[in-house]
UniProtKB/Swiss-Prot annotation:
GO terms for molecular function: neuropeptide hormone activity. It comes from Locusta migratoria (Migratory locust). This is Locustapyrokinin-1. Keywords: Amidation, Neuropeptide, Pyrrolidone carboxylic acid, Secreted. Its main location: secreted.
């Protein structure tokens, strides 16, 4: 979830 910069801080990586 992004902090409000408009872009997520890190790429979406599903936890397996």
């Amino acid at each position: 979830q992004d902090s409000g910069d408009g872009w997520p801080q890190q790429p979406f990586v599903p936890r397996l």
